[in-house]
Amino acid sequence: MAGNFDSEERSSWYWGRLSRQEAVALLQGQRHGVFLVRDSSTSPGDYVLSVSENSRVSHYIINSSGPRPPVPPSPAQPPPGVSPSRLRIGDQEFDSLPALLEFYKIHYLDTTTLIEPVARSRQGSGVILRQEEAEYVRALFDFNGNDEEDLPFKKGDILRIRDKPEEQWWNAEDSEGKRGMIPVPYVEKYRPASASVSALIGGNQEGSHPQPLGGPEPGPYAQPSVNTPLPNLQNGPIYARVIQKRVPNAYDKTALALEVGELVKVTKINVSGQWEGECNGKRGHFPFTHVRLLDQQNPDEDFS
């Protein structure tokens, strides 16, 4: 299913000058396909498409050739002798940002299409904290996690606290940007020296140290897939191969258990990223990031 946003509504997806760290703070933990567009801080005139996908935040550079267009571009024609700007992301070229966003509503970037812009309400919710305002804890014991929403850690790990929904269970982030619930009795409060904070907690999926808010962009950019369209179930059955094991909660009878290498018949594609399908004679829902779609033109090549 394609995204449910208006690509012509600039205010919903364009954030202007926003650092990579700020983008990660807004998108980390959001569902797959939530995104924003911002100005590149290292390449004036270019843009960056930041997207929550596959349990991390990916950043795709959008290069602009010629005069930079307004966002969204004005319908007025460029002056004589001035070539209209072209926007390039990976191997694809577009006349405008709305056209680019429309394309990735129905084509995969890496593991997701664009579903919806990140909510503006998160900007004022306190989600973006300067390093000196953040709260940290240090692990006293190893914790392997008991279910999918837990954050495993080792004794001595430094974690950043994001939220305290329960007295004995807090939401935290580790040095790789992974988030989850941690048991409070397993940790102690920790106050790092301000100069060493960036060495303790990473700010993006590449594992590089976070930069001050508004600082330069660390790490490389992701590259979108080449013309991977969202499949259409109306054209016939769609099959996928499991690439990540899934052990669902025992109390959720509608969830589908998956083993790496198994074949899944996809029966419904939901915009939330929770797909429905059949595997080993059972039906249920599963995260689409746990499977890889087979080549629908030559599916027999992947059935072995």
Swiss-Prot record:
Residues that bear Phosphotyrosine: 108, 221, 239
Sites annotated Proline switch: 237
GO CC aspect terms: actin cytoskeleton; cytoplasm; membrane; neuromuscular junction; plasma membrane; protein-containing complex
Ranges for region Disordered: 60-85, 201-229
Residue ranges with Pro residues bias: 67-82
Principal cellular location given in the protein's record: cytoplasm
Stretches that traverse the bilayer: none
Range of residues in the leader sequence: none
Residues covered by the SH3 domain: 132-192, 235-296
A Pfam entry, by short name: SH2
Biological-process GO terms, alphabetical: actin cytoskeleton organization; cell chemotaxis; cell population proliferation; cellular response to endothelin; cellular response to insulin-like growth factor stimulus; cellular response to nerve growth factor stimulus; cellular response to nitric oxide; cellular response to transforming growth factor beta stimulus
Expression across tissues: Ubiquitous.
PTM-bearing positions, type Phosphoserine: 40-41, 74, 83, 125
SMART domains with a match to the protein in the record: SH2, SH3
SUBUNIT field: Component of a complex comprised of SH2D3C, BCAR1/CAS, and CRK. Within the complex, interacts with SH2D3C (via C-terminus), and BCAR1/CAS. Found in a complex with ABL1, ABL2, CRK and UNC119; leading to the inhibition of CRK phosphorylation by ABL kinases. Interacts with ABL1, C3G, DOCK3, DOCK5, MAP4K1, MAPK8 and SOS via its first SH3 domain. Interacts (via SH2 domain) with BCAR1, CBL, CBLB, PXN, IRS4 and GAB1 upon stimulus-induced tyrosine phosphorylation. Interacts (via SH2 domain) with several tyrosine-phosphorylated growth factor receptors such as EGFR and INSR.
Record remark on domains: The C-terminal SH3 domain function as a negative modulator for transformation and the N-terminal SH3 domain appears to function as a positive regulator for transformation.
Function as written in the Swiss-Prot or TrEMBL entry: Involved in cell branching and adhesion mediated by BCAR1-CRK-RAPGEF1 signaling and activation of RAP1.
Descriptive protein name: Adapter molecule crk
Highest classification ranks of the organism: Eukaryota, Metazoa, Chordata, Craniata, Vertebrata
Underlying gene: Crk
